[in-house]
Amino acid sequence: MLSIIACISKVHRAIGYKNRLLYAIPSDMTRFRMLTTGHTIIMGRKTFESLPNGALPNRRNIVISKTREQITGCEVYTSLEEALAARKEEVGNKKASDECFIIGGASIYEQALPFADKLYLTIVEKEPEHADTFFPEINPAEWEVTEKEMRNENGLPFTFLTLYRRQ
């Protein structure tokens, strides 16, 4: 199963500014960690470079990069298709868990969205002052909301959504 996980602003679907996340929401970070631990995560090179401590622990880290330059704690592939093929082979050999998470950035989200089975979104009500990176548009007719939890942390309202692709 291919899942996408992201924290986005409600109106413009903003996800970042200058290679940094827009929102630091503790429960969103906890949700991310709980969902992705023990699974494969796929990200672009810039997303990897934005991680403060490098590869995320207790996950299979895959980085998509135009170069095959080695990255400590990660597997590197030159395309999303190549990474998904390698992962599919490992799932078939029972060497990897079934669920795989796309964790960013914008280009990888856009490439993966047509293949995704599930979306885990945190929708933040407040638009950021600045943003230069955006999540692709989602066609609501293609997705069914299966879980919705409204929250408010430190005066910031947001919603956890889980969506499955309609058959």
Language-model-derived ranges and their functions:
Residues 1-167:
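Enzymes that bind and transform nitrogen-containing heteroaromatic metabolites
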